[in-house]
Amino acid sequence: MSIGIWQIAIVVILVVLLFGRGKISSLMGDVAKGIKSFKKGMATDITDEPEPKNVSENNQDSKDKE
């Protein structure tokens, strides 16, 4: 026994009647803004990482200080 197209249609109609089209569209807009800000945050995190120094450079710096 699987879910048919009529059962899905009835559920969609009930959701639209309960929440209204305006509420659903504003909710989807908020979800889209959240996804965009998440992607933007992930992109800036990747580009903000400093380049690692070579180990030999770190050893030379410590030897010069001694």
Swiss-Prot record:
The chain crosses the membrane at residues 1-21. Residues 50-66 have a biased composition (Basic and acidic residues). One of its GO terms (molecular function) is protein transmembrane transporter activity. Its main location: membrane. The keyword Transport applies. One of its GO terms (cellular component) is TAT protein transport complex. Residues 43-66 are annotated as: Disordered. Keywords: Cell inner membrane, Cell membrane, Membrane, Protein transport, Translocation, Transmembrane, Transmembrane helix, Transport. GO terms for biological process: protein transport by the Tat complex. The keyword DNA damage does not apply. It holds the Pfam family TatA_B_E. It is found in: Cell inner membrane. It is a single-pass membrane protein. It comes from the Bacteria. InterPro entries: TatA/B/E (IPR003369), TatA/E (IPR006312). The Tat system comprises two distinct complexes: a TatABC complex, containing multiple copies of TatA, TatB and TatC subunits, and a separate TatA complex, containing only TatA subunits. Substrates initially bind to the TatABC complex, which probably triggers association of the separate TatA complex to form the active translocon. NCBIfam families: tatAE (TIGR01411). Belongs to the TatA/E family. PANTHER family: SEC-INDEPENDENT PROTEIN TRANSLOCASE PROTEIN TATA. Part of the twin-arginine translocation (Tat) system that transports large folded proteins containing a characteristic twin-arginine motif in their signal peptide across membranes. TatA could form the protein-conducting channel of the Tat system. This is Sec-independent protein translocase protein TatA. It comes from Pelagibacter ubique (strain HTCC1062).
